[in-house]
């Protein structure tokens, strides 16, 4: 039986997340704390990032709901 090779997940840093979402650092932290944004992962003592696929899925879910502020 062949073993499955796990997919490699890309990690993006804060700058890329902010560019993709147009959100400030404080808004990202608030949404994350409320469970409304993907959780960051610790990369090192002073480095964090997010899985790109989770951020993309979050953006897609906003687009399906009509974007922020549309009561979705």
What are these regions (language model features)?
Residues 34-41:
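Short, solvent-exposed alpha-helical "recognition" segments
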Residues 66-72:
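C-terminal secondary-structure termini that scaffold catalytic or DNA-interacting sites
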Residues 1-33, 53-64:
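Polyanion-binding surface elements
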Residues 41-47:
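Short Lys/Arg-enriched helix C-cap and helix-to-coil transition segments
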Residues 50:
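Exposed, tryptophan/tyrosine-rich binding patches on extracellular proteins
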């Amino acid at each position: 039986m062949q073993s499955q090779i796990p997919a490699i997940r890309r990690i993006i840093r804060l700058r890329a997340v902010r560019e993709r979402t147009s959100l400030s650092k404080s808004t990202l932290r608030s949404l994350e704390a409320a469970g409304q944004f993907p959780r960051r992962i610790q990369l090192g003592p002073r480095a964090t990032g997010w899985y790109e696929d989770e951020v993309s899925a979050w953006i897609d879910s906003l687009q399906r709901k009509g974007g922020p502020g549309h009561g979705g």
